[in-house]
Each structure stands twice: as C-alpha cells, then as structure tokens.
Amino acid sequence: MKNKSKLLACCLMALPISSFSIGNNNLIGVGVSAGNSIYQVKKKTAVEPFLMLDLSFGNFYMRGAAGLSELGYQHVFTPSFSTSLFLSPFDGAPIKRKDLKPGYDSIQDRKTQVAVGLGLDYDLSDLFNLPNTNISLEMKKGRRGFNSDITLTRTFMLTDKLSISPSFGLSYYSAKYTNYYFGIKKAELNKTKLKSVYHPKKAYSGHIALNSHYAITDHIGMGLSFSWETYSKAIKKSPIVKRSGEISSALNFYYMF
C-alpha cells in the first residue's frame, strides 16, 4: 500500500542540518522510488519519479512527496516539543481496479481521502539523555476512517556531511478504514478470485527504515532510504492482498534555502 506521508517521512527524516548553511529552512527536490505492493497488482515492482517539498511560512508549512502530503500549522512549545494541526489531501491506501490482476479487477477503485490530522513531536535528547533521538505521533481522520502512526528515530552524524537515521514504528488503522481499503462487498464478487464477502476489523502494521543523507554543498544534498512494513492479519487475509509486507526504497536530490 503506497502511503505518501511515509514516503515523505523517509525522504525528509533527519536531514543533516549541521552540514548546511544556517537559515536553510525550506527544501525542494526530486527523486525516484521503487517498491512492491501488498495488493494483487499486475506490476511486480513499481518505479516512480516524484517531487518533494518542505516549505515553511512562519508557523505554517507545506510538505509533499509524490503530491501534497500535508498543509498545516506548527506550534513550538519548547525547543524539544512541538505540535501540528494539518490537512492531508491524499491520505489512504488507494488502488485502481485497472492495476489489479484479472480476477481481482471487479472491485471498485479505492480512493484517497482528505484527512484532518494532529501531530506531536518530541526530542528525547534531554529527557532520556538520548542525543539526536526523536519520537513522533501522528493521528489522521477522514470520511473513510482513522489511522495513526508512532515512530522513533535516531540520527548518527558519521561525518560533517553524512548522516544515517534508523527508525521503527507502529501504525493503527480503524475498522472503517481497513474495511474500505481491504474489504470486499457483495457487489464486487465474481466467479473466479473474489467469491466471498470480506469485512475486516481494525488493523495494525509495523515498519522499520534506514535513511541516509549527504550534503554535497551548503545548499544541495542527496538522500537514500530503505523501508520495510508488515501488516496484521486483518489486512493479510484480504482477498485483494497478495503479501503481508512490502519493501521500498527511494533516492532523492534536494536544494535547501
């Protein structure tokens, strides 16, 4: 399931800010991602180019990877803690019937949703004496359901220009969300692959990632990320799901100003 917010997080996570000129708060870039899908799709591996951005206007910000992922307002309470209220225009796990294998293409398209979200971000450096360690919580709700994610990230500066950032996290999907994207309705049944109705309940996933960033100049950098995500039984048992997990990678080049 392609999640633009998680792709954005992998691309922007733990940028080596110390390697860039002071005051570089905005970012634009291009990249390419490759990965498989848990859906019963025709393509074994999807390779797609994408644009990425992270722009701030005072407390307001705009972020995106492969589309506009977040448009929001961030409030910094302390140097270690901040919150954000945002709009996610393309949330969800969309899939088009034309992309599915024969026998699975009788379903209706699963579309994205416009979701309102709340984010919490805390730097654990002072609290637990964990340098360059961050925990983030994100909750989103739209007409097709609720989902949330909590991620722990630690950044290691290998040199003044190169950093790596391992992370791991858990995601939750409400029953309404899971049923819309992975359930099968009576009207979608056929005589080949989709022979019974499927109404899943709430679901979970776990994900790990490794991200690296290299500052080429004071303003130009590149990033490389790898991620793996595995899903709970409610999603794995869906007739339109092929595998329990998915692997993805992304390479990007960006300009900070």
UniProtKB/Swiss-Prot annotation:
Question: Quick one: signal sequence residues?
Answer: 1-21
One GO term describing the cellular component: cell outer membrane
Q: Does the keyword Lipid biosynthesis apply?
A: no
> Which PANTHER family does this chain map to?
MLTA-INTERACTING PROTEIN-RELATED (PTHR38776:SF1)
Q: Which InterPro entries match?
A: MipA (IPR010583)
- Which family, according to the similarity comment? Belongs to the MipA/OmpV family.
Sorted alphabetically, the keyword list is: Cell outer membrane, Membrane, Signal
Where is this protein localized, as stated in its record?
Cell outer membrane
Superkingdom, taxonomy of origin: Bacteria
Its recorded name reads 24 kDa outer membrane protein
What is the originating organism of this protein?
Answer: Pasteurella multocida (strain Pm70)
